[in-house]
Structure formats: C-alpha cells, structure tokens
C-alpha cells in the first residue's frame, strides 16, 4: 500500500518528554518538520524523599533544559494515581498468581497512550502526541494506519506497544523510529542537547533501577521454599517463587552440585501448589522447551486479527529472534500457537506479539504452554 504523509504545518504535537535522548530528539525532529511542538513531563510514581532509585527530579530538570534549548513550553502532569490503579496493582496481582508480568506494556497502554493522550486532548488541545519509541507508523491510502517495527532492529520497541488501538496509533508520531540509535545520539550532540550522552533508562517502567527483590518484598510477602531438580531431589532453597522466572540462570545459589555435570542450572518450572522452584541443567533442558502456547486477552492493532491457520512470526519476549508459527483460534479470545521448532523459556504472564513482515499485528498474554 502507498504511504501518505500527514499535513504538518500548524498541527500541534505534545511530546512526552522523559528527560532522555530519544524524546529530546523527537521534539527537535518534529519542530524541523513544521509541527507546533510542546513538551509534557509525566510523574507516575510517588517516591520517598530519601529515595535513591527514582530520578524523577533529575529527569524533569533535563527535560526542562532540553525544552529551554529548543524554545518550547514544558508542561507537567502527575499520573501517579492512574499508574498505581491501572499498572502497579496489575503487576502485583500477576506476581502473586505466580506469573511474570510486563509492566512496561501495561504502562504504555494505560498511561503513555491513554491518560497522556486524554490530557493532551482535553487540556492542551493536541492534534497528535509523540513519544521517543523506536517504532514507525504508516498511513495508508485506504485510511488505515499500521504500526511497523523500528528501523533499528536492536532498539525496536513494537513488542511493548502491541496493545495500542488503531486510533491511538493514528494519533501518535514516532520520529526516532526512522533512525538508528547512534544517529539519534549524534543529532542530540550536534544540537547541543544535554541528554546526548545520557544513558538509557532500565528497570521497571517509571519506578527506576531499584533492587528488584527488595522492592517487590515491600508489597508482597516472600514465601521461601525448596529448590528441586526435575527428578525431585532437593538441592537448595529459594526466597520466593515471585523472584524467579523461567529460563533464569543467575542468582540461584546452587553452583557446584555433587554428581552434576558442568552445565549451568536454569529455572525450568515453578510448582505453585508446592511452592517449589524446579531447576535443570542446560539451556535446552526438556522441561524448559515448549512446542507452542495458548494466548488469551487478544488485541489486534487494526481490529482484525490474522486469519485462522495463518503462518506468521511471534516474539515471546523483547529482542527475541522471530519465531515462525501457525495460529489456530480456539475462540474469539484464545489462540493456539504452534511453533515450527521448540522454543526455550516461554513464560506465562508475558506477552506474545505477532508480526507479518515489518507490521506489528498485535498479540496477547501467554496463558499456558504446550509441551510434548
């Protein structure tokens, strides 16, 4: 399909300014394209006064410096209540149920592209919003808008944005999605932006780089239990199943076991009923492999999902190689996905995101694994 460009002149864009390099360059590029640009900084977590992990004040300072340099307004908004209700409580409930959620995906759905868009609409009278995500949008002549992978394969963030609606994608601009990361940093450097060499943020969306076990333990009581081999031999103890995920190799504290080979130990299963962490040696241990999965809570960006029997590709985690697969609908909200080859460490609670070439079709939540 042929792509068409939106008319830029006079259109007002509210850019989500995070205090990082990607949003900084996004604002600059949109100004170059003729948009009327303003920034909006979101505060989504109420940190303690002595909180060493949250850098919200520093990020706001950097965002303000960038906006001052570009000569644009910076607005601020507090979405902490919305974040707690719609993202953090979901995050805790999933961990409590023994699954491994992805809060960044929920944050994009509920905060960055919902609460933010509503605020930009109602208060700031925006035509578009923009974020520093590495994805692209394509406006087609038939009136549809598609979300595409970012040009930089290593930074592509479409996996985190699959829950966006067609309408949200149509109202959003992603300037850095057309660029490689090194190009973004070079533009920021050339423009003298303070964020040009600022490191990328990591950790839980908006909560920062806390020690995860310590942070989670503040909200959910830990339940220590045994670590067993796949054969049922007790070889250690864990502090709580919620601290572990399938395929995990580090932090198990069970190296140098007698009668074991030199292969590293991996988490291969979590027995919720017995509160037992099951481990096995080798990254392709049979208990770690799946032939497929059941995926529910389906969402398709353009409202129409792939047809029954489609042979496409899926990612079950960020930055994973594409996995060829075949889809079968069990009902309107459940997909049976069969992989062409067995896949390691597919994790219930995580998202499965489907692609047709460069187009991100949508996805759902991994509910059950198909083994054997």
Swiss-Prot record:
Q: Note the SS bond partners.
A: 107-205
Q: Name the GO terms of the biological process aspect.
A: tRNA wobble position uridine thiolation
The entry's ATP-binding residues are 16-23, 42, 132
**Major location (coarse):** cytoplasm
Active-site residues, as the UniProt record annotates them: 107, 205
Per its UniProt record, what SUPFAM superfamilies does this chain match? Adenine nucleotide alpha hydrolases-like
Q: Where is this region: Interaction with tRNA?
A: 155-157, 317-318
Q: Where is this site: Interaction with tRNA?
A: 133, 350
- Catalytic reactions on record: S-sulfanyl-L-cysteinyl-[protein] + uridine(34) in tRNA + AH2 + ATP = 2-thiouridine(34) in tRNA + L-cysteinyl-[protein] + A + AMP + diphosphate + H(+)
Any matching Pfam family: tRNA_Me_trans_C
The first-level EC class reads transferase
**Quick one: a GO cellular component term?**
cytoplasm
Where is region (Interaction with target base in tRNA) located?
A: 102-104
**Care to name a GO molecular-function term for this sequence?**
tRNA-uridine 2-sulfurtransferase activity
Query: Could you tell me which InterPro entries the record lists for this protein?
Result: MnmA-like, MnmA-like_C, MnmA-like_central, MnmA-like_central_sf, Rossmann-like_a/b/a_fold
Q: What Enzyme Commission number does this protein have? A: 2.8.1.13
Q: What is known about what this protein does?
A: Catalyzes the 2-thiolation of uridine at the wobble position (U34) of tRNA, leading to the formation of s(2)U34.
What's the protein called, per UniProt?
Answer: tRNA-specific 2-thiouridylase MnmA
| Source species | Shewanella oneidensis (strain ATCC 700550 / JCM 31522 / CIP 106686 / LMG 19005 / NCIMB 14063 / MR-1)
Q: Which gene encodes it?
A: mnmA
């Amino acid at each position: 399909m042929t792509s068409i460009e939106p008319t830029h002149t006079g259109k007002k864009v509210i850019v989500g300014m995070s205090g990082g390099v990607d949003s900084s360059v996004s604002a600059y590029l949109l100004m170059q394209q003729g948009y009327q640009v303003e920034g909006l900084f979101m505060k989504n977590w109420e940190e303690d006064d002595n909180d060493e992990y949250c850098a919200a004040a520093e990020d706001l300072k950097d965002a303000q410096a960038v906006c001052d340099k570009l000569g644009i307004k910076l607005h601020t908004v507090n979405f902490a209540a919305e974040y707690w209700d719609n993202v953090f409580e979901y995050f805790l409930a999933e961990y409590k149920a023994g699954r491994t959620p992805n809060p960044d995906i929920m944050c994009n759905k509920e905060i960055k592209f919902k609460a933010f868009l509503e605020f930009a609409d109602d208060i700031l009278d925006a035509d578009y919003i923009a974020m520093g995500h590495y994805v692209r949008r394509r406006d087609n002549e038939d009136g549809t808008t598609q979300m595409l992978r970012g040009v930089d394969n290593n930074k592509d963030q479409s996996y985190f944005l699959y829950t966006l609606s067609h309408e949200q994608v149509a109202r959003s601009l992603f300037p850095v999605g057309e660029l490689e990361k090194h190009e973004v940093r070079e533009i920021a450097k050339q423009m003298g932006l303070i964020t040009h060499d600022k490191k990328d943020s990591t950790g839980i969306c908006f909560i920062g780089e806390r020690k995860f076990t310590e942070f989670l333990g503040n909200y959910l009581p830990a339940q220590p239990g045994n670590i067993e081999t796949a054969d049922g031999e007790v070889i250690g103890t864990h502090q709580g199943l919620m601290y572990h995920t399938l395929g995990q190799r580090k932090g198990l504290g069970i190296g140098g076991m007698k009668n074991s080979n030199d292969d590293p130990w991996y988490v291969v299963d979590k027995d919720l009923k017995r509160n037992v962490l099951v481990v096995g040696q080798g990254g392709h241990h049979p208990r770690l492999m799946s032939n497929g999965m059941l995926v529910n809570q389906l969402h398709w960006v353009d409202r129409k999902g792939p047809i029954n029997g489609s042979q496409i590709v899926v990612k079950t985690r960020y930055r994973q190689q594409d996995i060829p697969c075949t889809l079968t609908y069990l009902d309107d909200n459940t997909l049976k996905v069969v992989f062409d080859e067995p896949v390691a460490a597919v994790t219930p609670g995580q998202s499965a995101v489907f692609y047709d070439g460069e187009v991100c079709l949508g996805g759902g939540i991994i509910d059950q694994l198909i083994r054997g």
